[in-house]
Design a protein with these regions (language model features):
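Long, small/polar-residue-biased beta-strand-and-loop interaction regions
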Residues: 2-177
Length: 177
């Protein structure tokens, strides 16, 4: 019995020393630090009037098949970023041939369309400006008086910081959102 008690005491002491040894091992910490920058873009619209670029003005009368000069320009006022934009149309009256993204003209090959969005394929550097399109072609089908309509084209732009971000322009959703 005395022998068993000694062996048990020795085993307990060894176990206690072993556990203490494990806790005495050096610890390793991994720190991952990511810095975010300021993503800041500005969208302004312009038009050509008598060959000169001027700020966009509403209320232009356009004939069927006519072209409306409208130049949405996105300026990067923050860190390097990727930009995407969408255009939505609304009108006071319904039409058999409503305006759609197909009516946009002058879209550079630097933009890729996926669904309702146009994605700029390159990063936009601080201070850089990119233009989405140059204008809107009014459908030829708008010939009847009931299509004497007031319509709006609303452009919305979004940006995401380029650092730590890799869009996939071959996939279903380039930004994966």
């Amino acid at each position: 019995m005395k022998k068993t008690g000694k062996i048990g005491s020795i085993l307990c002491l060894l176990a206690l020393l072993g556990l203490t040894g494990i806790y005495a091992l050096p610890k390793v910490y991994v720190l991952y630090q990511a810095n975010t920058g300021k993503v800041d873009i500005c969208l302004k619209e312009y038009m050509l009037e008598e060959g000169k670029e001027v700020p966009w003005k509403n209320g232009k009368d356009v004939l069927p098949g006519g072209f409306v000069s409208k130049i949405p320009r996105i300026r990067n006022d923050g860190v390097e970023c990727y930009v995407r934009a969408t255009v939505s149309f609304s009108s006071q009256k319904e039409s058999e041939k409503p305006l759609s993204l197909e009516n946009l003209e002058g879209i550079s090959s630097d933009w890729v369309r996926d669904g309702d969005y146009f994605y700029y394929k390159h990063t936009v550097k601080p201070g850089e400006k990119v233009e989405l399109f140059q204008g809107i072609r009014i459908p030829w089908e708008w010939k009847t008086p009931d299509e004497d309509n007031v319509w709006k084209a609303c452009v919305r732009a979004e940006a995401v910081q380029a650092e730590y971000f890799s869009p996939d322009f071959t996939g279903e959703d380039p930004w994966g959102m």
